[in-house]
A protein has these predicted regions:
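Concave beta-strand-loop units of leucine-rich repeat
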Residues: 1-4, 8, 16-28, 32, ...
Length: 381
């Protein structure tokens, strides 16, 4: 017999283990636990036909994780007015009509290891003010506005969201962006405005071709590492950083035609650019590097994704004029650039090198020794 109501459990005060109500499509009302104060294990509500989520007015503590999923008729969550403690993570998944997560406001002062917000299709904004969470994962298909205080100390994972506006939030500890929607009908921008500083940033684009463009229009500094994995097969567009000035370390791998950083002045540590990429029969080569104001790099590395075959190495780049502004570099490592015949663009940077250990050059169309480079023999005759 299908369960249609839970009023017989009104006297329940504590659950030592897990509290799990799942796949009960006949249960249309869920307000029968007014005296429940503690769940020792995991708390799970999933696959219920309820339109309102109420009835946990006394619940203060969940020892394990909290999971609310596939509650397709629920538009708001007001069921936990005194909840103060969750042992591990909170997951809200597949709540297609949920328009407001006032539940997060109740978590102020509570520490969460992880918060997962997946496929909340009706949600357009999210207030993170006061939320203390080590990792926040957001997956969906609609653009969002994230509100909060200036600094968000969390590892933020953004999966498939076509742009997020940061309102009040200027700094985030770590950000990972992946699986942006693909479009082939024309340029579409996926903007992430408001962010000015990030600890580490990882961008991963997908295998399929796309004219969609990820943009960080206000980002000026990445204090840790920038990892760009710009596609794994067919052509995608390079992520745009119009005002990014300082990066600690940067790695680029991908299938873009160009890598552009119009305002970048310094890469404190290593700048590692793999100028070609191979996946099966698909071979992609960078055709342009644009760094007109880059003056300082700790270690400059231009190499290839795979050294197994010459046909997999870049044969398009013929010079390094993109680095004409570069004045200060600790190590120059240029290898497997089969079209490269001129190092003239590194003339200023070479002037500051002091010994041959800072000059690693080989398997290019032209391979000047350290002595030749210091003597100005920077182009193949």
């Amino acid at each position: 017999m299908a369960i249609t109501e839970v009023s017989s459990l009104r006297a329940l005060k504590e659950v030592d283990g897990n509290f799990d109500f799942s796949s009960m499509s006949a249960l249309t009302a869920f307000n029968g636990f007014p005296n429940l104060t503690t769940v020792g294990g995991n708390f799970t509500l999933s696959g219920l036909a309820v339109s309102e989520l109420k009835g946990f007015d006394a619940l203060t503590s969940i020892g394990g994780s909290m999971s609310l999923s596939n509650l397709n008729e629920v538009t708001s969550i007001d069921a936990f007015p005194v909840l103060k403690s969750i042992g591990s993570q909170c997951s809200l998944i597949g709540l297609k009509k949920l328009q407001d997560i006032s539940l997060l406001a109740q978590f102020k002062g509570m520490h969460l290891n992880n918060c997962i917000l997946n496929n909340l299709d009706a949600l357009t904004s999210l207030d993170l003010t006061g939320l203390e969470v080590d990792a926040l994962q957001i997956t969906g298909k609609n653009a969002l506005t994230l509100k909060g205080s200036k600094t968000l100390n969390t590892n933020l994972t953004i999966n498939g969201i076509p742009g997020i506006s940061f309102s009040g939030i200027e700094e985030v500890q770590n950000v990972s962006v992946s699986n942006m929607p693909a479009t082939i009908t024309g340029r579409v921008e996926y903007n992430f405005p408001g962010l000015k500083k990030i600890g580490t940033l990882s961008v991963s684009q997908a295998y399929g071709a796309s004219l969609g463009v990820l943009r960080f229009p206000d980002l000026t500094e990445i204090s840790g590492k920038l990892t760009l994995s710009e596609g794994f097969g067919q052509k995608v567009q390079p992520t745009e950083f119009p005002v990014l000035r300082i990066v600690n370390n940067m790695t680029y791998t991908g299938v873009c035609d160009a890598l552009r950083f119009p305002a970048l002045e310094e890469v404190t540590g290593e700048l590692n650019i793999k100028t070609s990429y191979v996946n099966g029969s698909l071979v992609s080569m960078l055709q342009e590097i644009y760094t007109p104001v880059l003056k300082k790099v700790g270690i400059l590395v231009l190499t290839t994704y795979s050294k197994n075959q010459d046909s997999w190495c870049n044969n398009v780049l013929t010079n390094l004029d993109c680095f004409r502004a570069l004045e200060n570099v600790g190590v120059i490592n240029i290898e497997y650039q089969l079209g490269l015949v001129s190092f003239k663009g590194l003339e200023k940077a070479i002037g500051g090198l002091t010994d041959d250990t800072s000059w690693v050059v080989g398997h290019n169309a032209y391979n000047p020794t350290f002595e030749q480079a210091k003597n100005g023999e920077l182009e193949r005759n």
